[in-house]
Each structure stands twice: as structure tokens, then as C-alpha cells.
Design a protein with these regions (language model features):
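Walker A/P-loop
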Residues: 3-4
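Charged, low-complexity C-terminal accessory regions
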Residues: 7, 155-183
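Conserved substrate/cofactor phosphate-moiety recognition/catalytic segment
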Residues: 8, 12-51
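Anionic group-transfer/hydrolysis microenvironments
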Residues: 22, 71, 118-120
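Short aromatic-enriched loop/helix-cap "lid" or pocket-rim segments at secondary-structure transitions
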Residues: 29-32, 78-81, 126-128
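Glycine-rich phosphate-binding loop used to anchor ATP phosphates in small-molecule kinases
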Residues: 43-109
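A glycine- and Lys/Arg-enriched "phosphate-lid" helix/loop adjacent to the NTP-binding pocket
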Residues: 82-168
Length: 183
């Protein structure tokens, strides 16, 4: 759907801090694939992403706008989905511990706005994703998990759905962000 590219481009466009998906660097450095991840890996993802986002939000370079590539709700979504897949190493018991940590971190976060990309089109293989979960059915199931968690955590009222092509989504976020800056 182009989430990471969108976040990077928005950060550069507004000269604002933006985060990357911390888990991807962790996985590259650890030489571990999605299906090999266990509970300790997901706890590291949660803490690593939270700390990265927090450091960028609190950075002296932040003039009030920050774009996050990922957070605890996204990590929890993947963990829940992977824990239900017998081809993945993550167990339902490990997921229960991940869920507690993810929910604690979600409560600490106070997002002003959350943009959610809905699944559409063909998933582009970036050679860093578990392609067994890249079909439209799987991506829609992941989206529904995220949506349910956004509702359950009280964050759904902050959500704007991005369902256009890349440029339409970019312009939608730019328009919203300019409105915030002009206040």
C-alpha cells in the first residue's frame, strides 16, 4: 500500500521528523524472517518502535508535526495474525504477553490523527515481507484486526481512511497537515 514511502515523503515534504519501521532493521540485523519471530522479538519491536517514535516526537527538530510509520497497534495486529498461523513460530501463548505490552504502550500514546491505508491493488514484494500473507484476503483480515483494535482502544475517532492511489493519499494528508499548521 506504500505506507513507508508515504511516511518518508510526508516527513521530507514538511521537513518534519518521521519514523521508519523499527522491526525491519531488527529483522535484518538479526537475520530472522517473519515466520521465525517469537514473543521476545515482538516485545523488542514494541519497545523499539515506541522508543524511536518517542525520541523523534521529543526531538528539538520537531516543530509540532511527526509522521509515524508504525506503532504498537500495528505490531499487535501482525503478532495476532501470525500467532494464528501454524506456519509461523509465534504461539498464541506468546501473543497473550505481547497483547498486554502492546495495550500498555497504546495507552501511553496520544495520537492526534491516524491515517490508515486500506488494502487495495497488488501487493509489491519488497523482499522483506512474508509473502504468504500478501494476498488480498490476508491483507483484508489484517486490516480488520487493526480496525477492531483502533475501535477497542478508543482511537477510531482519530482515523482517516486513505483509499486512493499513492498521490491521492499523499495529497489528502498534505491538505490535512497544512490545515493543522495554519491554525
Amino acid at each position: 500500500e506504500g505506507k513507508s514511502t508515504l511516511v518518508t515523503d510526508l516527513g521530507k515534504y514538511f521537513n518534519a521528523p518521521y519514523s521508519y519501521e523499527w522491526a525491519r532493521d531488527y529483522m535484518r540485523e538479526s537475520c530472522v524472517s517473519d515466520w521465525e519471530l517469537d514473543g521476545a522479538d515482538y516485545i523488542a519491536f514494541l519497545e523499539g518502535q515506541y522508543n524511536l517514535n518517542k525520541s523523534l516526537i521529543n526531538s528539538p527538530a520537531n516543530n509540532g508535526i511527526f509522521f509515524a510509520d508504525s506503532d504498537s497497534m500495528v505490531t499487535k495486529m501482525y503478532a495476532k495474525y501470525y500467532s494464528q498461523d501454524p506456519s509461523c513460530d509465534l504461539t498464541p501463548e506468546e501473543y497473550e504477553k505481547i497483547e498486554v505490552t502492546a495495550d500498555e504502550l497504546t495507552r501511553k500514546c496520544r495520537w492526534d490523527k491516524i491515517f490508515v491505508l486500506v488494502p487495495h491493488g497488488v501487493f509489491v514484494d519488497d523482499h522483506e515481507r512474508y509473502m504468504a500473507h500478501s494476498g488480498m484476503k490476508e491483507r483484508q483480515e489484517l486490516y480488520e484486526l487493526l480496525k477492531a483494535d483502533l475501535i477497542r482502544s478508543g482511537n477510531w475517532d482519530k482515523v482517516t481512511i486513505l483509499d486512493g492511489d499513492y498521490y491521492e493519499n499523499f495529497l489528502k494528508v498534505v491538505e490535512y497537515t497544512k490545515g493543522i499548521i495554519e491554525r
